[in-house]
Amino acid sequence: MRKKNYKGRCEKQSLEKFTTICKTYDPIQSAYANILVKNKDVAEVRCNVPLDGDECGEYMTDFVCKKTDGDLMVRECISTKLLEKPLSMKLLDMSRTYWLRHSVSDWGIVVDAAEE
């Protein structure tokens, strides 16, 4: 989850199942985009989907996937080192609440591998 007008480094890829060019902003997003392409349960993927509404209008969800059974699946990518930060938790909770209001129950986070 990041701001709509994020100015960081962006990698653009043309991937199967994605409705537009896939723009990823970190290695976690990039790796998960490739996982979604290989997932047989996923029919279509949209990335960096803006959240509508006043309370969350400046942010985007990382991945909104339409599954083969017609249900939606939402995934937010975040580094494990950011998970304990209050703002990160607030944004993730805002995303989860937003998608629950839009009848999406399959919401989850994607984290990088924990370093030992």
For the regions a protein language model found, what residue spans apply to each?
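Electrostatic, structured charged patches in enzyme active sites and in nucleic-acid/phosphate-binding
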Residues: 1-116
